[in-house]
Amino acid sequence: AQPSMRLRF
């Protein structure tokens, strides 16, 4: 399962 939104820092 993959998150729909990935936070990029």
Curated annotation (Swiss-Prot):
The compartments listed are: Secreted
Annotated positions of the Phenylalanine amide modification: 9
Name under which the protein is recorded: FMRFamide-like neuropeptide FLP3
Keywords associated with the record: Amidation, Neuropeptide, Secreted
Q: Which cysteines are joined by disulfide bonds?
A: none
User: One GO BP annotation here?
Assistant: neuropeptide signaling pathway
The keyword Secreted belongs to this UniProt entry's keyword annotation: yes
Chief location: secreted
The residue stretches assigned to a coiled coil in this entry are none
Domain of life, source organism: Eukaryota
The Swiss-Prot or TrEMBL record describes its family as follows: Belongs to the FARP (FMRFamide related peptide) family.
Q: Does the keyword field hold DNA-binding?
A: no
Can you cite an annotated GO cellular component? extracellular region
